[in-house]
Amino acid sequence: MKDLLGLMGKAKEMQAKFQAMQDEIATVESVGQAGGGLVSVILSGKFEMKSLKIDPSLFKEDEVEILEDLILAAHNDAKAKVEQIMQEKTKALTSGLPIPPGMKLPF
């Protein structure tokens, strides 16, 4: 019974830590760039786009597809950075816990 109560206490503690981590990640902003900085995107930790900057030299009718590709690449770059931050924080929080590799935690 003592072990069960201890386990339940640890579960509540972990839940509180995960919530704090999620709150912290929500405040993170990540910058993604493409085209050597011609396009940049800022994403929040919740993957909301906060900013999009495009160099005016890209506003040419015959370069629309290039611009579209650069916007997508910048967004994906920022998204990958946010995901990396989330992974690092989750790993630090769960170190020492018997969690199977590759298990996605509730985010």
From Swiss-Prot:
Listed Pfam families: YbaB_DNA_bd
Compartments (UniProt record): Cytoplasm, Nucleoid
Keyword Transferase tagged: no
Disulfide bonds: none
Coiled coil spans: none
GO molecular function, one term: DNA binding
Family matches, as SUPFAM superfamilies: YbaB-like
InterPro entries per record: YbaB-like_sf, YbaB/EbfC
Swiss-Prot/TrEMBL keywords: Cytoplasm, DNA-binding
GO cellular component, one term: cytosol
Record-linked HAMAP family: DNA_YbaB_EbfC (MF_00274)
Assembly description: Homodimer.
Role of this protein: Binds to DNA and alters its conformation. May be involved in regulation of gene expression, nucleoid organization and DNA protection.
Sequence similarity: Belongs to the YbaB/EbfC family.
Cross-referenced NCBIfam families: DNA_YbaB_EbfC (TIGR00103)
Protein name per its UniProtKB record: Nucleoid-associated protein mlr5504
Species of provenance: Mesorhizobium japonicum (strain LMG 29417 / CECT 9101 / MAFF 303099) (Mesorhizobium loti (strain MAFF 303099))
